[in-house]
Design a protein with these regions (language model features):
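Short, conserved alpha-helix that lines the donor NDP-sugar binding/gating region
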Residues: 158, 162
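Hydrophobic pocket-lining residues that define ligand/cofactor binding sites across diverse proteins
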Residues: 165
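Short conserved active-site loop signatures built around small residues
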Residues: 154
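Compositionally biased, intrinsically disordered linkers/stalks adjacent to structured regions
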Residues: 146-150
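Short, high-confidence coil segments that cap the C-terminus of an alpha-helix
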Residues: 169-171
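Conserved "HGTGT" condensation-loop signature of ketosynthase/thiolase-family condensing enzymes
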Residues: 1-144, 182, 191-211, 217-301
C-alpha cells in the first residue's frame, strides 16, 4: 500500500532565515536557496576548549522546554493545516516523534543555580517521554509515540507510522522530527571522532566527519497516492560490531526497501546517502551502493 505525503513543514539552517516553511502536496517542489555556511559551537573536552562548525537554526543558543514545545506545536498544526485536515485532527491523529535531543537542553540549563523550568519539570525524572506527555495533555491525543535511535530516530518514526497506516489502525499520521543543540549530543559525537573540525563536508572522499545542526520537520501522511508518494520502507540492525558497519547489512536494507516498493534498482533516480564522514561507515555504505546502485546519482546532505 502506498502512502501519500499530503503536507510537510521544514525549519533548518538552510531554510530562509531559519524560519519554518509549510507546504502541501499541491505546492510543487520545496523552494531552493543558496546554501548557508555553518556557524560554530564550542565545548570543553578533556580539559581543552574546542570550537567546531555547527548549523544553528533557532534563535536561542539553548532552547528552553517551553520554547521547544511551542516550535514543535507550530510544526504539527501547520502540517495538519496544509494537509487540509479538520481542526480536530491534532487530537485524533497518531503522532510519531523522532529525536535524540528531546528536552536535553532544558535539563542542562536546570543544572545552573537559580534556573527555574517554565513547564515545571520534575528534576528527579529524566524521561524521553516528556514531549509526548506534553502533547497528550495539550492536544488531548492519546496516541503519541517516541523514537530515540540516534541518527535513525525520525526515519524509524516514519517507518512505524507507515506500518500503522498500512495495517488500517489509523487513517492519518503525523511524523515529527527535531534536533536542537545540547552539549551531551555534541560532546558524544565528538568523543567518537565523528564531527568535522572544518566547514568542509566531503563524505566518501575525505572522511573528516560530519557537521551537526538543528532542525525540525513534520510530515502529514495518508493512505493512497499523491504528488509525493512513499512507496517502500525498510529497517535493519547491523550486528557486526559497535563501531563498524557491515556493507552486506546496508545492502540488505536497500534491497528490502526496493522489494517493499515493488521497484527495481534501475528505477531509482537519486540516493540520499547517510554519509556520516567516518572511514569505516562510509566505506561500507559506498560498497553497498556500488553493488546495488552503481550508476545512481547520490546526494549527501
Amino acid at each position: 500500500m502506498n502512502i501519500a505525503i499530503r503536507a510537510a513543514t521544514l525549519q533548518c539552517a538552510q531554510s530562509r532565515n531559519g524560519q519554518m516553511h509549510a507546504f502541501s502536496d499541491s505546492d510543487g517542489l520545496y523552494p531552493l536557496h543558496a546554501p548557508a555556511a555553518p556557524a560554530e559551537r564550542s565545548l570543553a573536552f578533556l580539559g581543552r576548549h574546542i570550537t567546531l562548525p555547527y548549523f544553528n537554526t533557532f534563535a536561542a543558543a539553548k532552547l528552553s522546554a517551553a520554547d521547544l514545545l511551542d516550535i514543535l506545536y507550530q510544526h504539527l498544526s501547520q502540517a495538519a493545516l496544509q494537509a487540509d485536515w479538520p481542526s480536530e485532527s491534532l487530537a485524533n491523529t497518531p503522532i510519531f516523534i523522532g529525536s535524540t535531543a528531546y528536552l536535553m537542553s532544558e535539563r542542562e540549563q536546570m543544572l545552573n543555580p537559580g534556573y527555574v523550568s517554565e513547564i515545571g519539570l520534575d528534576t528527579g525524572r529524566h524521561s524521553l517521554t516528556h514531549v509526548a506527555e506534553h502533547f497528550h495533555h495539550r492536544l488531548g491525543n492519546p496516541d503519541i509515540f517516541s523514537f530515540a535511535t540516534s541518527c535513525t530516530s525520525s526515519a524509524n518514526a516514519l517507518c512505524y507510522a507507515v506500518k500503522m497506516l498500512r495495517a488500517g489502525w489509523c487513517q492519518r499520521a503525523l511524523v515529527l522530527g527535531f534536533e536542537n543543540f545540547n552539549a551531551l549530543t555534541f560532546e558524544h559525537f565528538h568523543a567518537m571522532g565523528l564531527l568535522a573540525d572544518t566547514p568542509a563536508y566531503t563524505p566518501f572522499t575525505q572522511t573528516g566527519g560530519f557537521i551537526c545542526g538543528e532542525a525540525a520537520a513534520c510530515l502529514a501522511l495518508e493512505c493512497g497516492n499523491g504528488a509525493a508518494t512513499l512507496r517502500g520502507i525498510a529497517g535493519g540492525t547491523d550486528t557486526l560490531g559497535l563501531t563498524h558497519t557491515d556493507s552486506a547489512a546496508v545492502k540488505r536494507v536497500m534491497q528490502a526497501a526496493l522489494s517493499d516498493a515493488a521497484a527495481q534498482p534501475g528505477q531509482i533516480r537519486l540516493v540520499k546517502t547517510h554519509g556520516i564522514g567516518s572511514a569505516a561507515a562510509d566505506e561500507a555504505e559506498a560498497a553497498a551502493l556500488h553493488a546495488l546502485l552503481p550508476n545512481t546519482p547520490r546526494a549527501a546532505l
